[in-house]
Amino acid sequence: QAEEKFLTEQKSIMKQYGLENVKMAYSCPICKDEGYKNGQMCKCLKKEISNILMKDSGFENLENFANATKTSNNLSPYYKKMQEWCHTDFKKNLLLLSGQTGVGKTYLTRCMANELIERGLIVKMSTAFKMTQDFKSFHKSHNEELLNQYLDCQVLFIDDLGTEPLYKDITLEYLYLIINERKMRKLPTVITTNLDISQIRETYDERIYSRIVDR
């Protein structure tokens, strides 16, 4: 109804100024810059939301797989596999990318995030540190938007798990909430970390460990 009302008002204004025969130039030819088409959120609006979420987390500048193939690092053999994953139905909805600092994990996830945004998905990418600060803010303010950005995005990237402070009654509790809720809703989560499997088990409780390593 809102969509129809908008179109009616637009036509009325155009007619008022004698512009009913003038063709509008739209940024998005699919939804004609309305953000929705046939009651569904358009790809252009999803992209704009993803860009806002990325900017909020400090991940404005993404990479792409076309350039990645020209960049040599320890994860180069995985580029094609991860690019293919970006176009699947995400049956495996939690990916753990573990490795030492400097092997290219963040670069790879920037490529993946860009690929998914271009596919038309709402993507959120955050460092574990920034996410934990949002947990802390939510714990004090109960502003649900602070958690919903992690719960509701179609694909979530958590970068550098293990570098975040472990606040009592906050870090582990909310991290479990995010990972478990997304897993139940079959929403994919991609995690990068410098920790190996044994270190993950030492750092986090059994509930988080079992979901991260997908036991």
PLM feature segments, named:
Residues 15-59:
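Interdomain "pre-motor" coupling segment immediately N-terminal to P-loop NTPase/helicase cores
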Residues 59-95:
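Pre-Walker A (pre-P-loop) alpha-helix and adjacent loop at the N terminus of AAA/AAA+ ATPase modules
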Residues 74-80, 117-153, 165-172:
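Short glycine-rich substrate-engagement loop in P-loop NTPases that contacts/grips substrate
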Residues 91-109:
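Walker A/P-loop nucleotide-binding motif
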Residues 93, 121-122, 152-155, 185-191:
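Loop/turn-to-beta-strand initiation segments
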Residues 107-121:
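P-loop NTPase Walker A phosphate-binding motif
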Residues 158-159:
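Hydrophobic residues in beta-strands of the RecA-like P-loop NTPase core, especially within AAA+ ATPase
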